[in-house]
């Protein structure tokens, strides 16, 4: 009975494991991650609104749950995009996937999901793996890259988003997806207000760039709906294990497309993070 929710999560993981590349192409064309996110999610919203109109879906604009989910998910998406544009893709993914550690604690307090001893052991293993990745001879913990901090904070936001998605059963899947799309647009606009120098030149708006943006928008439209469906059906901590497929996709795509590789200690720390996630999700 969980085949469709599992497929939904794996599809979402695949999309987010490969989507860094078109975002980088847009960045190379002179469009920052903030502006590309704004354009892409406006397109995504444009694709979605006819569906809401035709099906007469209610938009809960007066719901505080809707807007809280919107803001958290919006920050999660923006920070993730900025991290994968500026940082090493696999390193960013591994730091992002400390999210199950945060999910363990959030799901316990917000969802009253059963937290067992193995969950705390899993959290310890994952955090230890992160320390291995960050360790430097002259520093105990060394995060000097903006992309590292963005990846970590995005992972926390992702955990919060998934927990809220499962908690807010009174909201439909399409309403949750709409909250995410609107949230990205809101956060992007707020960022633009404080960073007015990132406006792309009009040379960007070529057919090939428009095609890239539309392709991303379509992928995000379907992946958001499917992930919301999957997370609604499967426990938050268990769902985290299926998102690990994203790391596999990212590792292969970053090597083949841009020749990225990471250090041995980062692989070792990453293996510990993955082991912790699998232990936490073990049913």
Regions found by a protein language model. Give the residues of each.
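Membrane-interface helix-cap regions at the ends of transmembrane helices
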Residues: 44-62, 128-142, 184-209, 255-256, ...
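Glycine-/small-residue-enriched transmembrane alpha-helix faces in small-molecule transporters
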Residues: 1-35, 79, 123-124, 131, ...
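Hydrophobic/aromatic residues within transmembrane alpha-helices
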Residues: 26, 36, 83, 95, ...
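Loop-to-transmembrane alpha-helix entry segments
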Residues: 60, 93-96, 112-132, 141-148, ...
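Juxtamembrane C-cap of transmembrane helices in multi-pass membrane transport proteins
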Residues: 14-30, 78-87, 95, 109, ...
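Helix-helix packing/entry segments at the starts of transmembrane helices
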Residues: 7, 39, 93-98, 168-183, ...
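Loop-to-transmembrane-helix transition segments
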Residues: 4-12, 56-79, 123, 146-154, ...
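Hydrophobic alpha-helical transmembrane segments of multi-pass integral membrane proteins
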Residues: 4-8, 33-50, 125, 149, ...
């Amino acid at each position: 009975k969980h085949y469709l929710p599992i497929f939904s999560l794996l599809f979402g993981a695949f999309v987010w494991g490969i989507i860094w590349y078109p975002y980088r192409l847009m960045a190379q064309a002179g469009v920052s991650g903030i502006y590309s996110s704004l354009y892409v999610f406006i397109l995504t919203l444009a694709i979605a609104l006819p569906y809401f109109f035709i099906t007469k879906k209610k938009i809960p604009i007066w719901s505080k749950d809707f807007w809280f989910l919107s803001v958290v998910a919006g920050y999660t998406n923006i920070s993730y995009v900025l991290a994968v544009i500026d940082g090493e893709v696999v390193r960013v993914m591994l730091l992002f996937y400390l999210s199950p550690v945060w999910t363990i604690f959030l799901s316990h307090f917000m969802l009253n999901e059963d937290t067992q001893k193995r969950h705390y052991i899993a959290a310890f293993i994952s955090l230890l793996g992160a320390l291995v990745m960050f360790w430097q001879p002259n520093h105990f913990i060394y995060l000097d890259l903006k992309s590292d901090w963005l990846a970590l904070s995005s992972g926390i936001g992702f955990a919060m988003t998934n927990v809220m998605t499962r908690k807010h059963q009174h909201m439909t899947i399409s309403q949750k997806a709409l909250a995410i799309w609107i949230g990205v647009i809101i956060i992007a606009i707020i960022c633009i207000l404080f960073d007015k120098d990132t406006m792309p030149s009009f040379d960007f708006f070529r057919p090939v760039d428009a095609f890239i943006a539309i392709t991303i928008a379509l992928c995000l439209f379907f992946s958001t709906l499917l992930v919301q469906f999957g997370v609604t059906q499967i426990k938050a901590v268990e769902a985290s294990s299926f998102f690990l497929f994203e790391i596999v996709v990212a590792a292969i795509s970053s090597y083949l497309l841009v020749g990225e590789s990471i250090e041995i200690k980062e692989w070792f720390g990453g293996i510990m993070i993955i082991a912790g996630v699998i232990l936490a999700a073990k049913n």
